[in-house]
């Protein structure tokens, strides 16, 4: 039933908002910040029972292939698809489609990420089974997250008319995708019960999404066709190198989903999802101690400290806090970050500043 169902894990990002732990040599998906395994390993682990390793594809950049394959050698190395340059998630989808249509013309793919936290693996597999069934109706499918609070850091999806029940789950036509809202708007959307968070996980038949790319992004489609024509011969890498830089960067949401002819959303019931988009979002996903503090690593000493996230580098660096609250303290060995949790999103500004200053050793 699922022999034509493939998981495509996007694993090429760097996660600049988790600096100073996330760096060029150790991107976000290779961090051990939620247990003993990396985020990438957890992303593969949770697919067990639905996708054999032979049907798990990984899209990443060339200098991360060896690292990721080393973390999960059971995935065949030929299943790693190399993205020559960052050109947005729409082009990643297109490249994965090219690879899969040569392997299995009847393929259905689940677009997943390597750097999210999901606590309820069984529910994810239920959602994916339901999405696979819906996708056979030649529609595009996205997974929605039932909001637990009025988040301003996520996009929202407005549910429309019911589409049907699949695998015991309700599905809905999508009325519209909405940008990350201001807090007042987020409160209204959460209260009305008609909106879910956009998880960034998508399921569709390869031919269906390629049809949407051809209709909405004809320039990208033409370039993908050139790449496809060379995919199985010795000119593949040269063609990729020549064509890929000419692709205009675009996201899945803007490039494909917002104007697609029909999109169906499946709201999660209790997925335990977090996109780990910042130190603050990681803090929100982990239970703290009696004082609300979370220690990811190390053995700090805390006096009169509340609501603080601490990650030490080693036993040689002792972190001591006195009379503070709502801080993020990260020691990576060569850099220390101290910031108010409310300003966690601004860590990306630090990375941009370091780039402008040419301080490559800290990137």
Cite the ranges covered by each PLM segment:
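Short beta-strand segments
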Residues: 9-11, 59, 110-113, 142-146, ...
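Left-handed beta-helix
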Residues: 1-3, 206-363
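Conserved core of the sugar-phosphate nucleotidyltransferase
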Residues: 121-243, 264, 341
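A residue-level structural signature of the nucleotidyltransferase/glycosyltransferase Rossmann-like core
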Residues: 57, 109, 175, 201-202, ...
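Residue-level signal for inorganic ion chemistry
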Residues: 40, 96, 115, 157, ...
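General beta-strand structural signal in soluble alpha/beta enzymes
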Residues: 58, 82, 111, 142-145, ...
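Conserved N-terminal catalytic core of the sugar/cofactor nucleotidyltransferase
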Residues: 1-9, 17-27, 32-113, 117-125, ...
